[in-house]
Amino acid sequence: MKIYEAKLNDELLEKLISMSAEWEAENSTYGYRKNDRSDIEENRIFLAEQDGEFLGYLFGHEEKSERASSIMVDGTPYFEIEELYVVTSHRSEGIGRSLFHFAEQAVKTTGIEFIMLSTATKNYKSILHFYIDELGMDFWSARLFKKL
């Protein structure tokens, strides 16, 4: 398996949109809809590929913190992960972990001090285990809802 940072082109954009449509069809994330060009442009894109087949992706962008003083000083550079996706047929193979670690090392070289993300998965126990126990992230906040 090869993990690398990719530059966006029309062919890659089409593939990322197709993969995000697969994610939408899974109905595993509250409110998730497939991406369009504007969701992907201006992001750093990391891919997992094997024998010409895309196995997963991670994309996100660099920000400076504002009003996050409980965890970092305002103006601190951080990388916001927008999406991390692995195709269903290749889950539990360490691909998501590898994508995260590769992106972590890549953004660290540009002076990034934190990685942040939000998740709307319906399987919160599994995702918290993945991000906290397996990847070493810390829990910051939670937004809960109850339909009435």
Name each model-derived stretch.
Residues 72-88, 142:
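Conserved acetyl-CoA binding element of GNAT-fold acetyltransferases
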Residues 91, 116-127, 145-148:
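Conserved beta-strand-loop-alpha-helix junction that forms the acyl-donor binding cleft
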Residues 1-16:
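A short beta-loop-alpha structural element at the N-terminal edge
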Residues 47, 53-62, 80, 85:
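Conserved beta-strand in the GNAT
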Residues 97, 109, 113, 121-141:
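Conserved active-site alpha-helix within GNAT-family acetyltransferase domains
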Residues 58-72:
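A conserved beta-strand-loop-helix scaffold within acyl/acetyltransferase catalytic domains
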Residues 86, 92-105:
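Conserved acetyl-CoA-binding loop-helix of GNAT-fold acetyltransferases
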Residues 24-49:
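Active-site rim helix/loop that mediates acceptor-substrate recognition in acyltransferases
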